[in-house]
Amino acid sequence: MAHPCATDPELWFGYPDDDGSDGAAKARAYERSATQARIQCLRRCPLLQQRRCAQHAVEHRVEYGVWAGIKLPGGQYRKREQLAAAHDVLRRIAGGEINSRQLPDNAALLARNEGLEVTPVPGVVVHLPIAQVGPQPAA
């Protein structure tokens, strides 16, 4: 099974910069993408994979994207404190101190579902007759 970020990397690591819209529209589009990525990460990625992603983001000083359910704010100077705080959380996730699903923001995001369409999993229910015990009449 591929991790969700491997199937649609633009959702996790891209920035909608080529659509010709203004800055506010781009920021809204980026926020929507990041929210969808966080929900998918938190729901579909195993905890071990989230820890690996967090470790990678910390080791490589990543500034953008969604890693282990944490949205990084970017590399702008004015966001350096937010980035440092996010890296601290990622360090703790990577070290196994915390579970990203249990962080207050992530738990709330999962609880309210944020409009993400969940693909239903088809299921089949088969009803079998109860086996008769004892001698069977000859046909």
Swiss-Prot record:
PROSITE patterns from the UniProt entry: 4FE4S_WBL
Superkingdom: Bacteria
Gene Ontology, cellular component aspect: cytoplasm; peptidoglycan-based cell wall
A single BP term in Gene Ontology: regulation of DNA-templated transcription
Residue numbers binding [4Fe-4S] cluster: 5, 41, 45, 53
Induction behaviour: Maximal expression during progressive infection is between 2-4 weeks, however low, stable expression during chronic infection.
Ligase in keyword set: no
A molecular function (GO) term: DNA binding
Post-translational modifications: The Fe-S cluster can be nitrosylated by nitric oxide (NO).
Effect of a null allele: Not essential in culture. Gives an attenuated infection during both progressive and chronic mouse infections. Mice infected with the disrupted strain induce a stronger host immune response than wild-type. Growth inhibited by S-nitrosoglutathione (GSNO), a source of glutathione and nitric oxide. Mutant cells are less metabolically active. When chronic infection was reactivated by corticosterone the mutant strain was not able to resume growth, suggesting that WhiB5 might be involved with bacillary proliferation during reactivation.
Subcellular location: Cytoplasm
Keywords, ordered alphabetically: 4Fe-4S, Activator, Cytoplasm, Disulfide bond, DNA-binding, Iron, Iron-sulfur, Metal-binding, Transcription, Transcription regulation, Virulence
InterPro entries reported for this sequence: 4FE4S_WBL, Whib
Co-factor(s): [4Fe-4S] cluster
Record flagged with keyword Transmembrane helix: no
4Fe-4S Wbl-type domain location: 4-77
Entry note: cofactor: Binds 1 [4Fe-4S] cluster per subunit. Contains 1 [2Fe-2S] cluster after reconstitution of overexpressed protein from E.coli. Following nitrosylation of the [4Fe-4S] cluster binds 1 [4Fe-8(NO)] cluster per subunit.
HAMAP family assigned: WhiB (MF_01479)
Function according to Swiss-Prot or TrEMBL: A transcription factor that is probably redox-responsive. Probably plays a role in immunomodulation and reactivation after chronic infection. Its induction results in transcription of a number of genes including sigM, and the genes for 2 type VII secretion systems ESX-2 and ESX-4. Seems to negatively regulate its own expression. The apo-form has been shown to act as a protein disulfide reductase. The apo- but not holo-form probably binds DNA.
The family this protein is said to belong to: Belongs to the WhiB family.
Protein name, entry field: Transcriptional regulator WhiB5
Top-level taxonomy: Bacteria, Bacillati, Actinomycetota, Actinomycetes, Mycobacteriales
Gene (name only): whiB5
